[in-house]
Amino acid sequence: MLTIKPLAAAILIVISFQAFAEMNSAEIQQVGTNNTGSLEQQGSGNYAYLQQDSQENSQAEIFQNGTSNSASVYQLQGSDNNADITQQGNSNNAAIRISENRSGSIFGSGVSSYQEGNANTLDITVTSYAAGVTMSSVGDNNSIRGEVTGGVSGAMLNQVGNNNGIDVNLGSSSYASVSQTGNNNTASVSGSSYRMGNNSTELTQNGDGNHASTYMGSQFGKVTLTQDGLGNQADIYSSGRSTTISGSTVGNNNTVNIDQSVETGSAIFAQSGDGNILNISQQALLTTSL
């Protein structure tokens, strides 16, 4: 007969509590440089909040495993920082905010987030200069929203699953790579205003019944779209000067609409399959030099 001593029993109770804890809340606030904040939660209905102010070379990490959890990271008035959120489970929510100080000196921040499960949401806002952003989700009915508006930044967004959505907005001279694998997904990418330029977007969808839309409002912008599957739709709009649109669709019953209101723009697109539709409209945009 196995006998459990009181100390061993207490340890087992603690381990069990940690593994199945629910409705916990944890908050970390740090001010200064070279800080590291880390939170880990197991269970459901948990809340994690990590804020770092006036910092440089700081690290913020949150890991949650369970359902209906919420995680937030705020990094304010600093530079060369990194923020990372990982969530595993369903119906989780993650938010990251990286903002500049009044002098706009924040730059070089790194942001990453990964979600695995269904019905999760991810919301990232980065106003820092020269930021690198990576957002990924695996599962169904997930949503990713990104505001990367600081300029000269790069965003990589990836989703695997069905009925997922991506919505990203770029600042000037920035790059976005969007990839979706699955069915009935939507992806939307918008660029900056006309006087800011050199934005580039690459959008790839593999699956059926997907919809991609992109608006490029900058000069010298570039859009590349690839869709592989059945019954997909793409809507591409660009305005400004010297914008380039290219891409291809492979499969049947796909529709592509391209609208360019530009100076010296170009559109090169190819389709392979049956019952496809390709519409290209180009209109000269007259500008006045100031």
Each model region followed by its residue ranges:
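Bacterial N-terminal signal peptides that target proteins for export
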Residues: 1-7
